[in-house]
Amino acid sequence: QDKPFWSPPIYPH
Protein backbone atom coordinates (compact mmCIF):
# COMPACT_ATOMS: atom_id res chain seq x y z
CA GLN A 1 0.00 0.00 0.00
CA ASP A 2 2.16 2.82 -1.28
CA LYS A 3 -0.64 5.14 -2.30
CA PRO A 4 -1.39 7.78 0.31
CA PHE A 5 -4.94 8.90 -0.28
CA TRP A 6 -4.85 12.52 0.83
CA SER A 7 -6.88 14.13 -1.94
CA PRO A 8 -10.68 13.85 -1.93
CA PRO A 9 -12.52 12.02 -4.72
CA ILE A 10 -12.93 14.42 -7.62
CA TYR A 11 -15.66 13.97 -10.20
CA PRO A 12 -14.98 15.89 -13.42
CA HIS A 13 -18.13 17.01 -15.17
Curated annotation (Swiss-Prot):
Secreted as UniProt keyword: yes
Location, primary (coarse class): secreted
Listed InterPro entries: Tryptophillin
Subcellular location: Secreted
Alphabetical list of Pfam families matching this protein: Tryp_FSAP
Gene Ontology BP, a term: defense response
Pyrrolidone carboxylic acid, modified sites: 1
Record has Methyltransferase as a keyword: no
One GO location term (cellular component): extracellular region
Keywords assigned: Amphibian defense peptide, Pyrrolidone carboxylic acid, Secreted
Tissue expression pattern: Expressed by the skin glands.
Similarity comment: family membership: Belongs to the frog skin active peptide (FSAP) family. Tryptophillin subfamily.
Protein name stated in the entry: Tryptophyllin-T3-2
Originating organism: Phasmahyla jandaia
Source species taxonomy: Eukaryota, Metazoa, Chordata, Craniata, Vertebrata
